[in-house]
Amino acid sequence: MILEFLSQGPALLVKGRRNVLVVADLHLGIESDLDRHGIHFRSRTRERCERLETCIRETLPDLLLLLGDLKHAIPFPSRQEQREIPEFIAHLRSLVPLGIVPGNHDVAIEQFFEPGELLAKEGVIIDGTGYVHGHMYPDVSLAGMLIIAGHHHPMVSLRDEVGCSLRSPAYLFSLLNDGCIGFPVREGG
């Protein structure tokens, strides 16, 4: 298996028997939540869809795996989400088969997906790799595997001597061990 990080996503391509393009935490519809708090941005759903389409066309995956928090509003989809998500999903579905491991923001998400696309929120195994959103304990069947998770929104911030800074999404790697919440490295396979 080979992991290829795509900065234009940000996304991860897991190359194995099947190539799986993984994207987490899109939070479509966040703009309507911000608007309610006096912060006004236009919707960026179209731009997110275009970036994802670029990743799909460049990598030609066998599956697009949405790793949770496709939408933002809790507990019910906002009007913006009701309007934008069906079109977003239909467009992606026209390009590649897709699946979603629901995240903590994905309450009532099943209305947007076809049978077989909505996967277990406790995590799934695809070609020997575990996938979880990351907001709950992984299913015990994932013990001893490489686990790919979203949810945590890691960023790196670099500051120069003048005080200018650059912030960018980051990918974190870690072996699980007895000091971690999760599974010991050598347990389960």
Annotate each language-model stretch with its function.
Residues 1-83:
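N-terminal active-site segment of His-dependent metallophosphoesterases
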Residues 16, 23, 28-29, 54-59, ...:
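Conserved catalytic scaffold of divalent metal-dependent phosphoesterases
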